[in-house]
């Protein structure tokens, strides 16, 4: 979409959220309904850096992302349906795809069991530059939601890269948690199997004694 063309909608309603971060690392929500080119430019001037999180299932997202001034390759990567982890560099901008658990709305993130019900994965497309983090996904993603909660809760992030690192760390922690849960469940299954076997051996022994 050429930058001179007017968008057929106001603001950026295809954004899930948008934050402006100050030099001290504190994040402040931006009003996506009024975030047009003028307000976006003003936000970039007023804040050290921005985090824009898009919903790629929204048909308006390609037009909105096209107005961010990113290269064609980075724009295509953000909007692609690629389901392979990747990381590329173009100048000072890193972009690619990360894997994450899909998140069900209304589920308590802190108490949810990954190993039992988080069987499907989703894909986070991202581009991170010096003063702009753009992330995009089709479904809500668990680690991204967790980091978003941290931002809303007042956790400070000193750089664009720190937010992306936090998302990756959340996913890694969830994988470790799932592995631990799986190991515990396997131990329980093994204990039940051994108990059943022991019960069978005792029954066999009782039969042999009666036969004797």
Regions found by a protein language model. Give the residues of each.
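Peripheral, non-transmembrane regulatory/ligand-interaction domains of membrane transport proteins
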Residues: 1-212
């Amino acid at each position: 979409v050429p930058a001179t063309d007017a968008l057929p909608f106001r603001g950026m309603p295809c954004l899930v959220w948008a934050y402006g971060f100050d030099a001290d690392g504190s994040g402040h929500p931006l009003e996506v309904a009024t975030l047009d080119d003028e307000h976006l430019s003003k936000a970039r001037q007023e804040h050290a850096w921005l985090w824009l999180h898009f919903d790629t299932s929204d048909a308006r997202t390609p037009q909105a992302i096209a107005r961010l001034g990113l290269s064609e390759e980075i724009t295509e990567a953000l909007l692609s349906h690629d389901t392979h982890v990747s990381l590329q560099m173009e100048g000072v901008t890193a972009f690619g795809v990360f894997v994450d658990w899909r998140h069900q709305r209304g589920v308590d993130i802190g108490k949810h069991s990954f190993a039992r019900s988080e069987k499907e994965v989703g894909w986070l497309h991202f581009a991170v530059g010096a003063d702009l983090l753009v992330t995009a996904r089709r479904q809500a993603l668990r680690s991204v939601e967790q980091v978003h909660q941290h931002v809303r809760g007042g956790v400070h992030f000193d750089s664009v890269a720190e937010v992306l690192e936090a998302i990756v760390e959340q996913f890694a922690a969830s994988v470790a948690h799932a592995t631990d849960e799986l190991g515990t469940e396997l131990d329980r299954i093994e204990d039940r199997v051994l108990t059943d076997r022991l019960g069978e051996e005792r029954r066999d022994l009782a039969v042999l004694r009666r036969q004797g």
